[in-house]
Design a protein with these regions (language model features):
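Low-complexity, intrinsically disordered/propeptide-like segments
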Residues: 13, 17, 28, 62-65, ...
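Carbohydrate-active enzyme catalytic cores, enriched for enzymes
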Residues: 209, 249-346
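Mature N-terminal, pre-catalytic/accessory segment of carbohydrate-active enzymes
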Residues: 1-49
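Short amphipathic alpha-helical segments that mediate assembly, nucleic-acid/protein binding
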Residues: 6-10, 31, 44, 163, ...
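Intrinsically disordered, low-complexity segments enriched in polar/charged residues with Gly/Pro
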Residues: 9-12, 93, 279, 302-304
Length: 346
């Protein structure tokens, strides 16, 4: 029989979608239960530990944080731009992990010290857009991601000026990405940067602000229906045909979007047959303690299943009730019980 996968329309989803905040990382209606449930959770503790480290390390301006030693030696403008993007991404990605930890630490405790450090840090980061050292679409999408998380997570504590700062950045950066996607993305087989990161980030920005800025209604319609019609994979067999190293970069999108859509709609987006097929790809492409199977560029760097891959398999085991993914995780954790903690990232 042909598997049935028929998600609800966006109109039905939005009819039940809450107007309060937070509503993206968690629903405010479940907030106290989530805090209680995670009181002794080691993953929750990891976020709080990372957030505390941020508080003890004040952030400087980008020009003081970035290493331009190699950049200034290059005379070719293309090489300089590439090196600048690479070096600035190191700082911006680090700060995404920091801000995300601060937002989550606040949501897990309601301790306002995490909000204060988070908004101060993010205000500085957003000012980097005027710096000559800031470049690249990944960096810009990361600012959108941080602004969205802070807006939704800290909403009840934000001053009017802070809300406006975040909304202005969400509107401007979000519109930039939306206008790059529309009539382009849906007509291509794949667009790696979009599928890896920026599409997920725009989706969360849309649902964080829908009903509050007019642009978000358009983004929400586009992102929800694009996912249903095109994603998660390029083929139904569950394989990641554009390379295993590229698969790793897509892991957050492949879990976070369907998990979010499932929560707000009541429909199981992991029921898409692609996910159970993909569990087999994860296992066969890189068995426990094995190198990657050699598919695609940069596969040589995948020397053993890392924390991100094992964490992804763990999510599939839970969301799809997949015994093969569960066995894969169990086998690896027998030898490396801390493997999931190594997946800690923004």
């Amino acid at each position: 029989d042909t598997p049935e996968f028929n998600p609800p329309t966006l109109e039905k989803v939005l009819a039940e979608y809450p107007s309060h905040h937070p509503r993206v990382l968690l629903d405010a209606a479940d907030w106290e239960k989530i805090i209680a449930k995670n009181k002794n959770n080691s993953e929750a503790r990891a976020y709080m530990d990372k957030a505390s480290q941020c508080i003890s390390r004040p952030l400087k301006h980008l020009q003081e944080e970035i290493d331009t030693t190699n950049v200034v030696t290059l005379t070719n403008i293309v090489q300089r731009e590439s090196a600048l993007i690479r070096e600035s991404r190191k700082i911006v990605d680090r700060e995404e992990a920091n801000v995300e930890a601060l937002v989550r630490a606040y949501l897990l405790t309601k301790d306002e010290k995490y909000y204060r450090e988070g908004i101060n840090r993010l205000s500085e980061i957003l000012s980097w857009q005027k710096s000559k050292y800031f470049a690249g679409d990944f960096n810009l999408s990361t600012l959108l991601s941080m602004s969205t998380s802070a807006y939704d997570g800290f909403y009840n504590l934000l001053s009017p000026e802070e809300k406006q700062l975040l909304l202005d950045n969400i509107r401007r950066i979000g519109d930039k990405f939306y206008n790059e996607y529309v009539n382009h993305l849906e007509n291509r087989i794949a667009d790696n940067h979009v599928w890896q990161m920026t599409f997920r980030i725009l989706t969360m920005a849309a649902f964080a602000t829908v009903g509050e800025i007019s642009e978000a209604s358009v983004w929400t319609d586009y992102c929800y229906n694009e996912w249903i019609s095109r994603l998660p994979g390029l083929h139904k067999d569950g394989g990641w045909h554009n390379g295993d190293a590229y698969f790793h970069v897509n892991i957050r999108t492949l879990i976070e979007i369907p998990a979010f859509f499932s929560r707000i709609s009541g429909f199981n987006f992991f029921a898409d047959p692609w996910y159970n097929n993909n569990a087999l790809y994860v296992i066969y492409q890189q068995p426990p303690f094995s190198k990657s199977g050699g598919h695609g560029n940069s596969h040589e760097g995948q020397r053993s299943p890392n924390g991100g891959r094992v964490g992804y398999a763990d999510a599939l085991a839970r969301e799809c009730n997949n015994p093969w993914a569960a066995a894969y995780v169990h086998e690896i954790m027998q030898e490396d019980p801390d493997i999931l903690s190594k997946a800690f990232e923004a």
